């Protein structure tokens, strides 16, 4: 990667407020530096101390880090624990009646669930899974609405040592099918439908379609939660109603004690080369990362009401809905709906209603709400808030300032968190009682995280110059491998050409400023970031080319003030170039096609048609040229090797 010049200049800085510091878990830069130096002096001992402090072990570990077979690192691997026990049972002696979850439905129904009630529901469902013959090590795909039942399903899997793979409810039947096949799932947990923004979306019908696509004989059971009550097709020998499965089950289910390295879940994330990657996380190391970040980054206190708006189909929903908040005994809000239904103040109404103290959402949501003006949030009482968080993509400085001044009323710290599906928990983020914030920067690594920006050789990049973002030492919450694909894991995350394969390569470019703060600059591969979600170009291109009208396709991202990026598709049809009316009709057909193949989130915003794609005479796609075309920029690249220059004019036409 050539050196990247940083053009962002941001000089505003916001030290932690004295009132916040007085009550913070980590107070001041001296405390932060002391923790960081402790980790440098005794790296393994630092993490062992935290693991003993925050995790309840059935069998204590004696080994800390096994680095004898890099990059396949192991942590605490002679210890035993159960994740569900750590999230539920250990709270029952002191706070069984404390509210664990405040659920707010799409239509405004509120359900409160205590730790005792949640424990009972998880045990009943886990017993139901066992009654179906599901055992430790089996894989289950979860395709659920954003309701308490999704958390119950995940926790029940963890309770009996079953590896769950959650699929976002907006993904298509084909996406569900691919994940079922790759995981070798023995069961699918779903619902009749989900409701979002006043609309219903089929889930069970999508699962049925997925199971009819190929050899899915590994799936012997489909468990269906009755949500909307709509009529759905039924296969009596395979399908089971959730309520029938759990009705006669005991409220107690002995946890299965598993090795610290036992896989807790796989979560599929987009790659730049087509097939989604099954990111595999361990039990103990993953949980430790979630707990530590709840304590440090979110500065958790027992009276907090925590609300992370993410769906459990994404890693943020795993770490900061299903596992992190419950492991520390927090009360949290779970929301089924969208920010603007049935009115544009829905987020602020929920914060006011439930006295939310910690609010964690995506820049996409923030940008969409900015457009509605500052008057709207001012109608609501947001005085309960004490901390704001941002996740999913870098937040631009002006959105940060709006979030801080309008929502946080210039008193709530904003924690801009950098992390990934693969890291499992926060890596770089401002500890709010210690680190001064800069709008647009994720600031400094957490203690124990050895992050750096390096050039192609693995040497430190110059200050202010872009380079590869890496983590130089293994850390407990990192992915262990890619499901059934260890070589892809090694080549993707520990490539031999950077520092001999010893560094974790994040796939992001970044630079550091004069204070050592990290600034994320974007992806170094061809993964798109649409509304905070990573989507592979190859997957979308493959879907387009699968349509009988399409001969070739390439997609790139185009900056969008609300969604971060939108997808622009450059398409070569099998026939001649269409006229304007035909082009509009074909473009809409292809948009719908991609939505059905992958999911609505992958729907191209723009489709442009040309006689062929811009390639060099050696046949290499000129993707950077496409990015310039998508953005309406003046072409500055050398086009002397372009095979057919006339297509530049053709691809300038937006449909």
Swiss-Prot record:
Its cofactor is Mg(2+). The gene is acsA. Belongs to the ATP-dependent AMP-binding enzyme family. GO terms for cellular component: cytosol. Keywords: Acetylation, ATP-binding, Ligase, Magnesium, Metal-binding, Nucleotide-binding. The lineage of its organism: Bacteria, Pseudomonadati, Pseudomonadota, Betaproteobacteria, Nitrosomonadales. It comes from Nitrosomonas eutropha (strain DSM 101675 / C91 / Nm57). This is Acetyl-coenzyme A synthetase. Pfam families: ACAS_N, AMP-binding, AMP-binding_C. Catalyzes the conversion of acetate into acetyl-CoA (AcCoA), an essential intermediate at the junction of anabolic and catabolic pathways. AcsA undergoes a two-step reaction. In the first half reaction, AcsA combines acetate with ATP to form acetyl-adenylate (AcAMP) intermediate. In the second half reaction, it can then transfer the acetyl group from AcAMP to the sulfhydryl group of CoA, forming the product AcCoA.
